[in-house]
Design a protein with these regions (language model features):
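ABC ATPase NBD Q-loop/coupling interface
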Residues: 43-59, 127
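The feature captures the beta-strand-to-loop junction immediately N-terminal to the Walker
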Residues: 17-19
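Helical segment within the ABC ATPase nucleotide-binding domain
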Residues: 165-178
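ABC-family P-loop ATPase nucleotide-binding domains
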Residues: 72-149
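Helix-to-loop junction immediately C-terminal to a conserved catalytic motif
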Residues: 32
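Conserved beta-strand-loop-alpha-helix hinge in the C-terminal portion
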Residues: 203, 207-230
Length: 245
């Protein structure tokens, strides 16, 4: 990432689009605090807190959630145990009482039903043997349970058929409200047919080079990304020429 500035207020949905290697997933990982990435300059502020001073678990407790493009399988860890541990860790961090087993099961059942997730699926280890669509729905189930204040979805539409995409999008739309923000990282406009963004940002070479409304996604679907890069390059050359003169 190089000189990237992005502001996502509560109550808004922002889509991040761009070609492969433009920095979209890097942005998602940095926001969530993935240890493999080093921030050498700049700052990240969310709800008055400096995220760069917080470990990944502290960011999660502060309401930051990342849905992975490729959710990993965790053999030997029961899905229900995983979900309850994550939920109660967040509740403790926010000063709330932990949910007992009956209340937890009731909550999970309601959330799972809204996402067309079978409770039988949750009897299996986390993501183990799940289809691509099941893994993505499981990510959204986690999001629905944790109720994050900043949800980052890294290419959640990748590998989904139309039915799975519709169900996952429905889950995201149920979460969206005036008290949280959602960042959608995607290659394709089709996700934005179901989750309508307030703003669409185009990334290239680690920078945001264009911002527009939902209509920008439609134009990108029709014309690709090259015209945006060319437009940005021309504008940059014009600025340099004006500074020299």
């Amino acid at each position: 990432l190089r000189g990237l500035t992005l502001s996502v207020p509560k109550g808004e949905v922002h889509a991040i689009m761009g070609p492969n290697g433009s920095g979209k997933s890097t942005l998602a990982y940095i926001l969530a605090g993935k240890p493999d990435y080093e921030v050498t300059e700049g700052s990240i502020t969310w709800s008055g807190a400096d995220l760069l001073e917080m470990a990944p678990d502290e960011r999660a407790h502060a309401g930051v959630f990342l849905a992975f493009q490729y959710p990993i399988e965790i053999p030997g860890v029961a899905s229900m145990t995983f979900l309850r541990t994550a939920l109660n860790a967040n509740r403790r961090a926010r000063g709330h009482e932990e949910l007992n087993t009956p209340d937890f099961i009731k909550l999970v059942r309601a959330k799972a039903e809204s996402l067309n997730i079978s409770m039988d699926m949750l009897k299996r280890p986390v993501n183990t043997g799940f289809s691509g669509g099941e893994k993505k729905r499981n990510e959204i189930l986690q999001m629905a349970l944790l109720e994050p204040r900043l949800a980052i979805l890294d290419e959640t539409d990748s590998g989904l058929d139309i039915d799975a995409l519709r169900i996952v999008s429905q889950g995201v739309n149920q979460l969206a409200n005036k008290d949280n923000a959602i960042v959608l990282v995607t290659h394709y406009q089709r996700l934005l047919n179901y989750i309508v963004p307030d703003y669409v940002h185009v990334m290239d070479a680690g920078r945001i080079i264009k911002t527009g409304g939902k209509e920008l996604a439609l134009e990108l679907e029709e014309r690709g990304y090259d015209w945006v890069s060319a437009e940005h390059q021309a504008a940059s050359e014009t600025r340099v020429a004006q500074e020299v003169s």
